């Protein structure tokens, strides 16, 4: 679900960035395990997706939304659903991720610190440390405006 919601501009920006990287040689890299039949089905839209998988064809916006709450929603559904579930209410039986309603317990300052450094509202790493690592690795590159937009959306739910 995350990638299918990226805007056309975001896809173009990512593609341009990937093309700007120097080529690498990796003769040990295995070719894709996808058969020619599966590749054809993916291209023509006939691949039988599992019931619990997102359905292709969601129309993403042409550009990321300008309104802060709408931008926050866009960021949440393109960045947070991987771990917190498609509805952002958490998931996972063994080591469940929390519902993002927990964001309401954070002040804007504490939320920004979590996103940039991985330090939770209590001044320590998150309970399992997983979100702390993800924040430092993935979310620390968000701008202050993006973090504010994400917080606004999560608070509005």
Model segments located where?
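Electrostatic cytochrome c docking/interface patches
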Residues: 40-76
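Gly/Gly-Pro-rich "capping" loops immediately C-terminal to redox-active cysteine motifs
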Residues: 1-7, 34-43, 85-113, 130-143
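Ligand-binding pocket scaffold of soluble enzyme catalytic domains
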Residues: 21, 126, 142, 146, ...
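Protein kinase-like catalytic domain
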Residues: 19-22, 84, 116-119
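The canonical Cys-X-X-Cys-His
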Residues: 14, 72, 78-87, 111, ...
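Accessory, usually C-terminal, subdomains that scaffold auxiliary metal cofactors
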Residues: 118-133
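An amphipathic alpha-helix signature
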Residues: 8, 12-15, 19, 108-112, ...
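Extended, well-folded interaction surfaces typified by the phenylalanyl-tRNA synthetase beta subunit core
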Residues: 26-36
